[in-house]
Amino acid sequence: MRASSKKKVLVFDSGVGGLSVFQEIHQLLPHLDYFYLFDNEAYPYGELDQNVLISRVNQLVSALVAEHHIDIVVIACNTASTIVLPSLRDNLSVPVVGVVPAIKPASLLATQGVGLIATPATVTRQYTHELIRDFAQGKPVELLGSTRLVDMAEEKLRGESVPLDELKSILSPLCNKVDVAVLGCTHFPLIKNEIQQVLGSNVVLIDSGEAIARRVKALLSCGELEEKEEGIKRIFASAPPWQEDALNICLAKLGFNPVQIYRHLGVSDR
């Protein structure tokens, strides 16, 4: 009975990058029940038709919210956040929190320049350029879009080492140009240590994870909770994930059960 009274959080992404957001929320609020759902069948979202994306996310999230009586939804994906949040908020009766690149706090810290490391879809999206226009404080912003960094994060969670020489080559356009870098994809905090190693200790790395965690706490009105036991952690995928056994080893270290398959899509949305 006590377990059923816990607040339930759903973290959603197209891949496992949203686990970086889960970790921040869990660090602040360890006594909640956590559900993680990733739509790997349609990964990566940046290449998906917008209408298909809206339909998929709404169906998957709405089904899991209803089935598990979720109290708050976190869309831990920049692409989905910019495209799907309005319809999700219309369809759901629970709060929905999205992610945006942390341009404003980065610009307040920067003296030399800001680097935005994100996916190609994010760096070319109009919404991102509006964020830069409105919040960059006149600081120069260097844009770097990479899908390979996303793959590196996925591989790291499956026990593979991050190839530092390749990472250095990818990040080279930012070297000696910025003193603050925004990790503008939820995958990238998973390889934060490696990115820091390449860019150097003089570059400050910023992501949205802590801000999202504080927002979740505020929306759930979570004060000092009396509950001392940690909640459950369950993870679902829309299709069998690659290198599933290796992934499950990492997930177990985070307290999750092995990945379960979650199918709640119509034929037209596959």
UniProtKB/Swiss-Prot annotation:
Identify the EC number(s).
5.1.1.3
The positions flagged as active site in the entry are C77 (proton donor/acceptor), C185 (proton donor/acceptor)
Please provide the record's keywords in A-Z order.
Cell shape, Cell wall biogenesis/degradation, Isomerase, Peptidoglycan synthesis
Give GO MF terms, alphabetically: glutamate racemase activity
Q: Where do the annotations place substrate binding? A: D13, S14, Y45, G46, N78, T79, T186, H187
Highest taxon above the source species: Bacteria
Q: What reaction gets catalysed by this protein? A: L-glutamate = D-glutamate
Its UniProt pathway annotation is: Cell wall biogenesis; peptidoglycan biosynthesis
A GO biological process this protein is involved in?
Answer: cell wall organization
Pfam families (UniProt xref): Asp_Glu_race
Entry's family note:
Belongs to the aspartate/glutamate racemases family.
Q: What does this protein do?
A: Provides the (R)-glutamate required for cell wall biosynthesis.
What's the protein here called? Glutamate racemase
> Which lineage is the organism of this entry classified under, starting from the top rank?
Bacteria, Pseudomonadati, Pseudomonadota, Gammaproteobacteria, Vibrionales
Name of the gene encoding the protein in the UniProt record: murI
